[in-house]
Amino acid sequence: MSLSSHQAILLVDGYNIIGDWSDLKQSRDRHGLEAARYELVECLINFSAAMAYRTKVVFDAHYQDTPRSTETYTAALSVHYTAFAETADTYIEKFCATFARKKYQQESTRLIVATSDRAQQLTVVGYGAEWLSAPMLEREVGIAVQKTNSKTKKQTKSKPPGRFLFNTLDPAAQKRLKQMRQGL
């Protein structure tokens, strides 16, 4: 998908969100950071698709002496690991500064940053980005899940019974097909 097909770019401070959402905290405490990261990414893949967001989840190098890396999960979501000694905050601030300079806004794209870090909030808003706290993002994700589930239920109810192609035809076509089968 091209940038213009997305309504917004969502930058997520991964560890900040994990530290705030109770389900992710429990997963982190029971199974480790990797499990919590996986759950967050899975959750945001669906959310990004439902909202037509291009999402970048940013994780600190977390004491790992590794170079910066990116893992692309879908066309709408990628995970960015910062370089050693680079924080997610720094990565997000640099992205916001570049975003403001390059004027992605001309393409009517919004930039949203999800973090509960107050200093980060003030910085990104200063660059013209929108801000979502971790609890606000959790609510937005919950609303998107409910909407998706209700759409799925409506589609399931509207499906014709049976597994035959005949059942998918409109009544006039079914009548004509019956006549053809009977040789009329």
Model-based region annotation:
Residues 2-5, 9, 16-184:
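Nuclease catalytic cores that cleave nucleic-acid phosphodiester bonds
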